[in-house]
Amino acid sequence: MKLTDRWFTSISEDKKGNIVFVNGRLELDEFRLSGKLKIRIEIRWSYEADEHGLPTESAGKQIEEIELLIRKAMEKDKLAIMTGNYTGGGTKYWVYYARTERVFGERLNEVLAPYETFPLEIECEVDTDWEEYLDMLSMKDENSI
């Protein structure tokens, strides 16, 4: 199975009417259908937001830095793959599908060890059918980039 780096971007709204940018990964059917990545892990970070609910410049830089580090650590041996991320309403969401939540947690702690504590919330759930991913894919339309 080859992991590509093809994504789409779409715009949505949260429950409060804030704009949310949705970035979804494409070409993941082999991974989804393999049955190996059954645990959906959602990481949420409430960031410093501007008047539109989007990250301030400094928060945006920090989010980008952390996102790349986490993604590299998780995807190096396909322990987990990031399937999508959402930005808006003062919160960044990263969605991963993983083989095991225990090892995911250990790696996440290793990646974040050099940093001060981040206000992260993490939720894990068995999602063998990748329902969240398929819901996110439904947001891709002719206006997506």
Q: Which residues are covered by each model-predicted region?
A:
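A short beta-turn/loop motif at secondary-structure boundaries
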Residues: 84-89
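Conserved short beta-strand edge segments in small beta-sheet-based binding/regulatory domains
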Residues: 113-145
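Short, well-ordered beta-strand segments in beta-rich or mixed alpha/beta enzyme
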Residues: 91-99
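Charged, alpha-helical interface segments at or near domain boundaries
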Residues: 47-49, 98, 114, 124-125
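Helical (often loop-to-helix) elements that flank the catalytic cores of nucleotide-handling enzymes
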Residues: 102-117
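Residues at beta-strand starts and edge strands
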Residues: 37-41, 90-92, 118
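Charge-rich, low-complexity segments
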Residues: 1-69, 75-83, 99-102, 133-143
